[in-house]
Curated annotation (Swiss-Prot):
Transmembrane segments: 25-47
Domain of life: Eukaryota
Stretches with biased composition (Basic and acidic residues): 211-224
The species this protein was found in: Mus musculus
Assembly notes: Homodimer. Can also form heterodimers.
Known tissue expression: Expressed in heart and testis. Expressed in brain (especially in the cerebellum).
Keywords: Membrane, Repeat, Signal-anchor, Transmembrane, Transmembrane helix
Topological domains, Extracellular: 1-24
Keyword Transmembrane helix attributed: yes
Subcellular location field: Membrane
Protein name: Synaptotagmin-14
Domain C2, residue spans: 260-379, 415-550
Residue spans, topological domain Cytoplasmic: 48-555
First-listed, main subcellular location of the protein, grouped into a coarse class: membrane
């Protein structure tokens, strides 16, 4: 039997063979295709991984400066190579002087008008710097003009601390700044005659006392090598005698330091007879950019510490330099106990349909207050997780937190990762509220940059079965993130002693699996005695929120 098909015929046994071979051929070709696709995906993954590993951090902000210096170094090396062999006995200063003469001739031939900043930089490369000189100030006051609606003000001084007495006025009416003997040689105290705000000129000192002023927040560490510091380099006495009088010292380029969290223009007026304190918030400058805050509306909150019963807040203003000019009154501020009072300033970014976000805060202790007359000064805000704003009289690990957004840090565990949790249980509604307030000392073990963290909450029953779970939003690039997110779980009163609440902190990574930073558990299977005491205090608080710091356990 044969089937006719065109010019040739096929037997039945040939068709049977073809039908048996076709599925195998199709399977083989399919396997080859899948293998090729997998190899292609693996190649793309490896290529993307190496691409991300080879990319550095931020671009070098001083690339133009480095290019300029490299070209000058090349010119210097070529100039030194052209010298005769007999000129090797010349001193280094003479060779360097010839190099600068040749460099100046080259610049004059190309650019007739040389910038004064480049001249001062070329002069400074020949000098030898020393840490401190008593004849020159480390800061220079210059008037700076921002945008059209910005306030013209003088160079901001470093924030006052307890070791620096407040400014006063003598009988003649001329303002002064009182300096203690320990400050002589470290700072020059003077007053600006064209402004009502005092200013102090500081020099960098290698002593231990100056480390507090030189310490910067982690946001500025990446720019220390590229941006010149806000201090004028001075010559040592040996170089001063060699170079001549101090009148020939040029002023180098001294840029305005960039404030990261805002600066408040505040006026304090204290009346000791009436025990009344008037605080006027004029304006806010040096506000972070829109990319960091995500908004353009601002509001300032004030609270009198440590009682926290007298509060005030400004109206909402828009723009990069909002102007408030609002005065607030705080009563019952005794002059005998004024050292125990402080005013906390907080700058909030107000977003439409969103929760307010803290931009920066500062606690101003009234020990620095002028008890007679008005005192105007800038208040430089700091990150809200800065432990320097803690009140020593308040212990969050022993008492419940009335203000869940308190900025105090628990320092009892050192650099161990910690988390601040607020618990509240309403027996009437059967709702368990857990507020994740903030974290501390979160580290990225895989890299040196700050981690991108979020907190996961899981509620388990007595059998270890999951009843509910939720998580916070991700805080990117913050070792001390502020969450302030509340989660509600439905738990009956008879079940409250049989449930376990687990909080896990994770570091979210783009190309890799998430990494657990630490965890704690509260309730039936508490991870420690501190967690068990927190859970017991919540049940006995009768509807009041209880906040405690907890050290995270390693995974």
């Amino acid at each position: 039997m044969a089937i006719e098909g065109g010019e040739r015929t096929c037997g039945v046994h040939e068709l049977i063979c073809i039908r048996k071979v076709s599925p195998e051929a199709v399977g083989f070709l399919s396997a080859v295709g899948v293998f090729i696709v997998l190899m292609l995906l693996l190649f793309l993954y490896i290529n993307k991984k190496f691409c991300f590993e080879n990319v550095g951090g931020f671009p070098d902000l001083g690339s133009g400066y480095n290019t300029r210096t490299n070209s000058q170094d090349k010119m210097y090396n070529s100039y030194m190579d052209r010298d005769e062999p007999g000129s090797s006995s010349e001193s280094e200063d003479e060779a360097l002087g010839k190099y600068h003469e040749a460099l100046s001739r080259t610049h004059n031939s190309r650019w007739p008008l040389v910038d004064s900043r480049q001249k001062s930089y070329a002069w400074e490369t020949r000098q030898k710097y020393s840490p401190l000189s008593a004849e020159y100030d480390g800061y220079s006051t210059e008037a700076s003009m921002e945008d059209g609606n910005c306030i013209q003000r003088m160079r901001r001084t470093p924030p006052l601390d307890e070791l620096q007495p407040p400014p006063y006025q003598d009988d003649s009416g001329s303002p002064h700044l009182s300096c203690t003997p320990s400050e002589i040689g470290d700072a020059k105290c003077e007053i600006s005659h064209c402004s009502n705000s005092p200013r102090c000129s500081f020099n960098k000192c290698p002593s231990e006392g100056s480390t507090g002023h030189e310490a910067e927040s982690y946001h500025n560490k990446g720019y220390e090598d590229d941006v010149p510091s806000d201090s004028t380099a001075v010559l040592s006495p040996e170089d001063m005698s060699a170079q001549g009088s101090s009148s020939q010292l040029p002023k180098p380029f001294d840029p305005e330091p960039e404030a990261k969290y805002g600066t408040l223009d505040v006026t304090f007026d204290y009346d000791s007879e009436r025990q009344k304190l008037l605080v006027t918030v004029t304006a806010v400058t040096d506000i972070p950019t829109y990319n960091r805050t995500g908004g353009n509306s601002w509001q300032v909150h004030l609270v009198l510490l440590p009682i926290k019963k007298q509060r005030a807040k400004t109206s909402i203003q828009r723009g990069p330099c909002p102007v408030f000019t609002e005065t607030f009154k705080f009563n019952h501020v005794e002059s005998e106990m004024i050292g125990n009072y402080a005013v906390r300033f907080r700058l909030y970014g107000v977003h439409r349909m969103k929760k307010e976000k803290i931009v920066g805060e500062k606690i101003f202790y009234l020990t620095k207050l002028n008890l007679q007359g008005k005192m105007s000064l800038p208040v430089i805000l700091e990150p809200s997780y800065n432990p320097s704003g803690c009140d020593s009289q308040v212990s969050l690990s022993e008492a419940s937190c009335g203000d869940s957004t308190s900025s105090c840090q628990s320092l009892q565990h050192g650099s161990v990762p910690e988390i601040l949790i607020g618990l509240l249980y309403n027996a009437t509604t059967g709702r368990l509220s857990a507020e994740v307030i903030k974290g501390s000392h979160f580290k990225n073990l895989a890299a040196n940059r700050p981690p991108n963290t979020y907190v996961k909450l899981t509620l388990l029953n007595s059998m270890g079965q999951e009843m509910s779970k939720c998580k916070t939003s991700t805080r990117r690039g913050q070792p001390n993130p502020v969450y302030k997110e509340t989660f509600v779980f439905q738990v009956a009163l008879f079940q409250l002693s049989d449930v376990t609440l687990i909080l896990s902190v994770y570091n979210r990574r783009s190309m890799k699996r998430k990494e657990m930073i630490g965890w704690i558990s509260l309730g039936l299977n508490s991870s420690g005695e501190e967690e068990l005491r927190h859970w017991t205090a919540m049940k006995e608080s009768k509807g009041q929120q209880v906040c405690r710091w907890h050290a995270l356990l390693e995974s």
